[in-house]
A protein has these predicted regions:
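A generic structural motif
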Residues: 79-81, 222, 245-247
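Cleavable N-terminal export/targeting peptides
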Residues: 1-30
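Feature targets compositionally biased, intrinsically disordered low-complexity regions
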Residues: 8, 15, 31, 49, ...
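Active-site beta-loop-alpha junctions enriched in small/polar residues
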Residues: 89, 138-140, 184-188, 219-221, ...
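Detector for outer-membrane/organellar transmembrane beta-barrel domains
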Residues: 152-219
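Glycine-centered flexibility motif
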Residues: 28-32, 37, 45, 182-186, ...
Length: 255
């Protein structure tokens, strides 16, 4: 695993010479920072296919996960305002009373959920200093056995990645680069992974290498740092994250 990530990183450095204007990719399959969503969306008709390696601290429920895993997702942007994403997160069998013993330690199932974002105001729209404003939701339904119309997402139900949010983003030209300031109010009322309150993030793209986007955020729960590296005219994006400065997650995205 470490060798694979090293090869991808070296490839990004060697090939990442094309100037781009990319957005960071949230580990949940939506445009954002690292864990925290922001108010940005992709360009109209953008199609993204991505996958993440997620450390166990990045996951919302220890009883269901409690182990490192992977996810993969499909994301589509419509009308230059709307993002819709479908995310699948792999699950290993474990001795928690649900899985048969033959599945212990093996990837045997996956959690599936949708996420969506509506950008109400674009940055600079109506007024040159106007920040972007967006609202959205992740994992808005729950259920089992084929019943996914249950809206009881709070508490301890199956909607492990549930949250709704209101986000604002604004970018500034500063010496030697472009600075992004992001604020997001999140709410989920979950027992297992509470994300309730105001999160914030800072992104910085240096002028000397615009393929690189440095990120720090607080998602209301943890302080995270990371970077996004873009290559091949922004068709490939590699994301590296240190949750709480020590737990590694990484992503590769194609669009």
């Amino acid at each position: 695993m470490k060798t694979t990530f090293l090869k991808i990183g070296i490839l990004a450095i060697v090939l990442g010479w094309l100037p781009v204007k990319s957005y960071a990719q949230l580990t949940d399959g939506m445009t954002g920072l690292l864990h925290m969503v922001n108010a940005e969306v992709q360009k109209d008709a953008t199609f993204m296919l991505g996958g993440n390696f997620l450390n166990k601290h990045n996951l919302p429920n220890d009883n269901w996960w409690g182990h490192d895993t992977y996810n993969y997702y499909l994301n589509v942007t419509l009308f230059d305002r709307i993002e819709i994403s479908y995310i699948c997160t792999l699950v290993k069998g474990k001795p928690n009373g649900f899985w048969p013993e033959s599945t212990y330690g093996k990837f045997t199932n996956q959690d599936r959920h949708f996420a969506g974002k509506l950008q109400l105001i674009k940055e600079g729209e109506w007024w040159k200093h106007m920040p972007a404003l967006a609202v959205g939701v992740s994992d808005p339904t729950t259920g089992s056995g084929g019943d996914y119309l249950n809206m009881a997402t709070s508490g301890g139900g199956n909607a492990y990645f549930f949250r709704w949010f209101v986000a604002m983003s604004k970018h500034f030209n500063v010496p030697y680069g472009k600075l992004g300031l992001h604020a997001t109010y999140l709410k989920n009322n979950r027992f297992d992974y509470p994300l309730n309150g105001l999160g914030w993030g800072i992104s910085y793209r240096p002028n000397f290498h615009k393929n690189l986007n440095l990120i720090v955020e607080h998602d209301t729960k943890t302080l995270n740092v990371g970077a996004l590296y873009s290559l091949w005219a922004d068709h490939f994006n590699f994301l590296f994250e240190l949750q709480e400065g020590k737990y590694i997650s990484a992503a590769l995205v194609y669009r």
